[in-house]
Each structure stands twice: as structure tokens, then as C-alpha cells.
Amino acid sequence: MAENWQKVNTDPVCFGARDDTYGALSITKTGRVKTMKLVHRSGSIHCNPNDVDSYWSCTHSGVGNKLMTIITNTNKDALLPPTGDLETNPGNGKKYFYSLKGTGHKSPELVFRTLSNPLSLSRNQELQIWYGQDWVDVSEGNNSGQVCVDVFAWYI
């Protein structure tokens, strides 16, 4: 079966690591989407000045291979990954971690899992791409950097 990825951004979408610097994305096509993926274009993010670069997460030893890049609606409700996939950080009780088999903090693509209930998206609908700590306003004071991505949706 042929892959059915369609690019849904015109210019790269950039998001930061602190101070509500989400990346805003205006959807280019109405339809039902079974998943989305982000393709790294440029930049990196740090959750600590002493840790190495990451595209999707934090390389601090306490995080391991967990990911922290989240797509939300304008109400900041998690769409991808779905809220039920998010894990709680035991240090602060906030949910913003998740795992995707085969995807690490410097993978060139972040492909979210296929949804059992596809998303219904409308042309010109705004979605937001967040760095997890910034999304839940926790431990972001020493975060830095910005990542720019292309966004693809799998329409059904």
C-alpha cells in the first residue's frame, strides 16, 4: 500500500522550549487524519544547559528515551500523542512524556502512532506544536533553543 503523507505546512513551523513559544500551524486541507509526523528541518532544544542537543525531547539522564514534543489544539488539549499515551513525570506529577518505539531524541522524523479514532481537521484550523515542559509550565526556566519542522498528515 502506498504511503499517503501530505505536507500540511507552507513554511517551516518552529517551536521553542520555554515561555509559551509553541509553533502555530494552519491546516491546509479539511479531512480525517489517522496520524501525523514531524520532520526535523533545523535547530535543537535543551532542557538543561549541560545536556546535549535534542530535536524532540530532553537528553537529561532522568528522562531516558522519552519524547516531549506534543501537537495540541488551540485550547492546549493534546491531540498527538493522545492524552492517554502521556506518562506522568514522578518528580512533578505532570503528564508530558511518552515513548514511541524506534524513535529517539535525535530521530530525523517523529512519527506519531496511528489513532484508533482519526482526527477531524478543517482547512485553516490552527494546531500548536509544543515542547512538553513549556506546554505544562514546569522546569522550563533553564530550557533553550528552537526546532523547526515540516508537518505531514496521513489523510484517510
Segment roles from a protein language model:
Residues 1-156:
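Acidic, Ser/Thr/Pro
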